[in-house]
Amino acid sequence: MEIPPGLETTKRKVAHSDEHGFSDQVRVPNVIVMVGLPARGKTYISKKLCRYLKWTGFTTKVFNVGEYRRSDANAADAIHGANASFFSPNNADALKVRAESARRAMEDMADYLNSGTGGVAIFDATNTTKDRRRIIIDFCKKQRLRCFFIESVCDDPAIIDCNVTDVKVNSPDYKGLMTAEQAKEDFMNRIENYKKQYEPLDESEDESLSFIKVINAGRSFKVHQVRGHVQSRVVYFLMNIHLLPRSIYLTRHGQSEYNAMGRLGGDSPLTEDGQKYASALADFFEEEEVPGLRVWCSQKVRAAQTAQHLKPDFHTEYWKALDELDAGICEGLTYEDILQRYPKQADDRATDKYHYRYPSGESYEDVVSRLEPVIMELERQANVLVVSHQAVLRCVLAYFYDRPLSELPYIDIPLHSLVKLTPRAYHCDSTIYALDLESGEWTETSDQLPLCDSPRD
């Protein structure tokens, strides 16, 4: 069957972005440089920012100078990066080693960006002196790379102590070499060594310098000379993240009439099995007693019915952005119908499922774009339950699981299952609850959802 004129897919008529996240009209590789004393959350910010940029389509990589330093240590000097004296400004030999580690990281970063492999590089190190930052700026100018600084400033002892206790004492510098108490004492001495030479970012350093200061884990910010799309996205993201204890629950709606018939999209109501799941979901959260839980629901009938038995004080909001991927002219069809009527469309979708756009409909790439405000709100909020659809939840899970975009359309999300995500400093815990409709019992596993066996769904 021929596609009606004007409905051919899949490329937009505006400038298309390549696999590195750049428009075909302009390509400016970006270097994001972290600044700050140890235990200020620089690596946490680097990893979260890298995940976000990759999810939005920018090929991004973190270059952590500490890892280069540790790789430079030989077997006879395994502790050479751990002892606080190594970070003393008076330790000339150590300064040479640290400078060489930074140089190697910068060279690898430039190779990554200039080879066309990457679009954004994050240079994760303390970079606490003006001299060190000037070296980076001059290097980036020579390589024609756009440079943006992120300084994490913190004078809250509780935040610093939490970061040192929860993260640093278990870092590769200390693990297996010292007790937790020894590691903490040594790391606090390391911080004191850095303080002796710390020069905070300031516009007087260079009026043209582009930077953002993140103060006390996001309580306030200072932004200066932001340039370009990437830097604007970075600022937008940093102003929305936090690391307070919380959980994010994700579930598809219960089985709908279209699900039972194998049809795409539509707005059909729940089947009897779907209604059972809706009741069981309400019972689950009645028992869990999640404090301050908010419910975000798609505007489709099947999603609203799934959330209808939840307690009124959960405060349910209905988001158009959470609606299922629009299958366009294929809405209401089965996959067999599509193969028979639109074989070329079926083949195009199988070839590149992430970028494929249904005629008069959407692609997964489009869904990611409309979900960005949802992700930002999820980063800002406390406990949230999201009731939505398979394609939408694949996009959300790919973000929190840090899955590549090529895997995103294949994350297997069964009906009548609930995913609990608990964000941590450097990863996200995932627990899956599956409901047995006959017994009404939930089974629990701690794991990420796998990829689908079938490339069709």
UniProtKB/Swiss-Prot annotation:
GO terms for molecular function: 6-phosphofructo-2-kinase activity; ATP binding; fructose-2,6-bisphosphate 2-phosphatase activity. Its EC number is 2.7.1.105, 3.1.3.46. In the C-terminal section; belongs to the phosphoglycerate mutase family. It comes from Caenorhabditis elegans. One of its GO terms (biological process) is fructose metabolic process. Synthesis and degradation of fructose 2,6-bisphosphate. The active site is at D124, C154, H253, E324. It holds the Pfam family His_Phos_1. This is 6-phosphofructo-2-kinase/fructose-2,6-bisphosphatase. Beta-D-fructose 2,6-bisphosphate binds at R252, N259, G265, Y335, R349, K353, Y364, Q390, R394. PROSITE patterns: PG_MUTASE. It catalyses: beta-D-fructose 2,6-bisphosphate + H2O = beta-D-fructose 6-phosphate + phosphate; beta-D-fructose 6-phosphate + ATP = beta-D-fructose 2,6-bisphosphate + ADP + H(+). Beta-D-fructose 6-phosphate binds at R69, R98, T126, R132, K168, R190, Y194. The record marks R252, N259, H389 as: Transition state stabilizer. Residues 9-20 have a biased composition (Basic and acidic residues). SUPFAM superfamilies: P-loop containing nucleoside triphosphate hydrolases, Phosphoglycerate mutase-like. Residues 1-244 are annotated as: 6-phosphofructo-2-kinase. It comes from the Eukaryota. Residues 245-457 are annotated as: Fructose-2,6-bisphosphatase. ATP binds at residues 36-44, 163-168, 346-349, 390-394, 426. Keywords: ATP-binding, Hydrolase, Kinase, Multifunctional enzyme, Nucleotide-binding, Transferase. GO terms for cellular component: cytosol. Residues 1-20 are annotated as: Disordered.
